[in-house]
Amino acid sequence: MASLPLCGSVRSPEGLPGDPSSQEDRQDYDPEDPVSGSGSYSPTSTDSNDLEPEWLDSVQKNGELFYLELSEDEEESLLPETPTVNHVRFSENEIIIEEDDYREGKKYEPKLKRFTKILKSKKLLPKRYNKKNSNASGPVSILKHQSNQKMGVIVQQRHKDVNIYVNPKKLTVTKAKEQLKLLEVLVGIIHQTKWSWRRTGKQGGGERLVVHGLLPGGSAMKSGQVLIGDVLVAVNDVEVTSENIERVLSCIPGPMQVKLTFENAYAMKKETTQPRQKKAQLNTSDLVKLLWGEEVEGIQQNILNTPHIVMYLTLQLDSETSKEEQEILYHYPVSEASQKLQSVRGIFLTLCDMLENVTGTQVTSSSLLLNRKQIHIAYWKETDKLLLIGLPAEEVPLPQLRNMIEDVAQTLKFMYGSLDSAFCQVENVPRLDHFFSLFFQRALQPTKLHSSASPSTQQYDASSAVLLDNLPGVRWLTLPQEIKLELDTALSDLEAADFAELSEDYYDMRRLYTILGSSLFYKGYLICSHLPKDDLIDIAVYCRHYCLLPLAAKQRIGQLVIWREVFPRHHLQPSADSNTEVFQEPEGRYFLLIVGLRHYMLCVLLEAGGCASRAIGNPGPDCIYVDQVKTTLHQLEGVDSRINERLASSPTPCLSCADWFLAGSHEKLDNLTTSPILSRLHGASRVATSPTCRRTLFSDYSLKTRKPSPSRSGGPDSGLEGEGVGLSPHTTESQGSHGSEETGALLKVTKKKSALPNPFHLGNLKKDLSEKELDIYNTVKLTSGPENTLFHYVALETVQGIFITPTHEEVAQLSGSIHPQLIKNFHQCCLSIRAVFQQTVAKEKKKALNGKDHSGSTNSVSSLNPVKEHGVLFECSPENWTDQRKAPPVMAYWVVGRLFLHPKLQELYVCFHDSVTEIAIEMAFKLFFGLTL
């Protein structure tokens, strides 16, 4: 794993001409704006300027590259908030900044030190730098920060100080009606604000004061030192921009000498043409710090105090040598808590070897008590090697840990070819340490991963990660057909690789790589894929382990370029068919190229060999392929607004909030959340006074016991097996799917007149919704019956390797006191249900392989029992119930999972209210219908 340079300083404020990185995060870009549009990226711009790409110096000796450049907004967020200087008082000896935030007299530092401050705030600078600059205080010239020059060497300085005479009395000569520009009148500098800034009214720090002209007879022209193209950065060491220059100059009390600090135009131009020196490589833990924020050191310390370990052991010991710990090929971390687990490794080796000989099956997991704390251990054996991962039971359930170790083994094979190649090479140890550092922080501190996200988003991501992070699929975002067509066209053009330098006719030689496929992500969602299922899952699991999708979700990526050789299982596994007429994979090498830009992330799988040239040695990323992938992302700049509209739209299918179904007193009505889904359908109509769409308490509706479906009413396959689900103390598991109807929960509701109209009853909606709106409502309502009772869902399509579930925006609309706990219980329960499904699928596959089914096909085996269904009934009540005279209201809901073995393997998990009988097949049909890539 290559190190992570945070290269925010590479981008000059004005940007290099033709450099794609200079165009990042252009919020003022408008296709119809001739000024802003003139700087848009073109694929041939880098060729015309012959500039080295900014990531070139970060390529490692083995050809790997991991280059991450923060977006401009992210750089600003990492800096401590410092207000712009608006008012100063000039005197002969000092400049006094009159701001409340400057009580200690600390002056606002110039922008050239912004990147240094980022590194210092993230504690990424060496200690000697902090010591060297610890004594700096007071307003000093920017020139004093420059390094000492050698004698006899003439250097064009980047900054220069120019002293001019300023006379504010000139203002009395100007006409009263004329708009004063103090920069022109007092200093004699003409600065023309960009038209795009004037049009959008962009505020904030303002733009840089570039000298576009000099006023004849002005002080700047008389000095002879100010040139057109210089940039005014400070007045008497007070930073100025177009936003505050007029206010700063207005504070000059009378005629006096003023020091102006400029960035030298000639030096800046010369600097851009000089070859860049090798940048200092930062530690790979910088990605950890970027993801977990300023509290990363405290988080890491808490994790080290928690017992957890990963070990790679060998079962073949050399009896002649008695070397201590010779069976340990790799272990992480090195801490007191993990040392105790490491000391009992002999137990794990004995269990793995002995039980396999006795039972004939491999050990998958075990549990032990360490300091009265239960620790789960997961096993993964290959040949004579054993991979072990141990985590606390209170943090990671056992079914989740089994899935996690499978993902780890799969990812390491994808990156290194085999587990032996990963763990048995000394040069891989630092990379593995970084890999497992991210792994354990994701497992033990999931809520801290999204440090900049809202609390509700953090809670949803943490609760859903139990299930979603280990599903054999990628999170899919359904989009309108016209958007899908644009995305498919863009990826197809890239994959064709028959234009410009990618064409074999361009250089009259065989192309370097063949593009096997690509997949496009937006804000962490898969929106388009042209990859086979196995390749898609391999790449998605790699991105998940390195937390790349959360970075793109919050526009933290200014530019991301990743390049490495990979070993996809789909292409490297030997073919089972010996027929020569069947297609055989070429003996080639495979490379993964990932390019990120703002919210987009495009993953491309390349093949060297076969139709393309053979790769020799450890090739690094080719600039032409990187530029073409960037160009594809730039072509999609206009699509993101429509994707955001889809994310901000009403949930499809419609969801309900659990708090709306609470059966309680009239006083609890005020605490219910307004339904955003139905409010969109109501539009301009007014059903009642604001708020218009509150959930009534079913006061006119008697809740009946849910009737179990035939598959849920009994039988050997109907029960919920496996481990229990960790639930809230306020949530009780009322009835398993195998329970009888007599033990079901009966909710009794006092009948009284409804305080507000029931928005879920179509009888009330018919008066206010048009026929078209009713059609829309019925189309997006997933459940059957007159009322929408669906709370949450997850649908897994294993053939295509995707799953769909409500987006973060959709879940954020359904806030409440009970709903977040319902979502947490849903994912934990689905994890246990899916563990049962995995056993069922394994048994079916084993039957087919053993020849018990003569046809050898999965379809005929599954036709005897095509559907498996498991469900749990929950009852929950509000946590903080203050009314001692009345019992807290109770709400019952089902979590049901259904496994489809025919015609293709699919899984559906739904959570809905207990009041209405649901048909899971109907819901599955609606959800899966038209779900194609």
From Swiss-Prot:
Residues 37-48, 729-738 have a biased composition (Polar residues). One of its GO terms (biological process) is nervous system development. It is found in: Cytoplasm; Cell surface; Cytoplasm, Cytoskeleton, Cilium basal body; Cytoplasm, Cytoskeleton, Microtubule organizing center, Centrosome, Centriole. Residues 1-54, 703-742 are annotated as: Disordered. Keywords: Cell projection, Cilium biogenesis/degradation, Cytoplasm, Cytoskeleton, Developmental protein, Phosphoprotein. InterPro entries: CCZ1/INTU/HSP4_longin_1, CCZ1/INTU/HSP4_longin_3, CCZ1/INTU_longin_2, INTU, PDZ, PDZ_sf. GO terms for molecular function: phosphatidylinositol binding. Residues 710-719 have a biased composition (Low complexity). Plays a key role in ciliogenesis and embryonic development. Regulator of cilia formation by controlling the organization of the apical actin cytoskeleton and the positioning of the basal bodies at the apical cell surface, which in turn is essential for the normal orientation of elongating ciliary microtubules. Plays a key role in definition of cell polarity via its role in ciliogenesis but not via conversion extension. Has an indirect effect on hedgehog signaling. Belongs to the inturned family. This is Protein inturned. It comes from Bos taurus (Bovine). The gene is INTU.
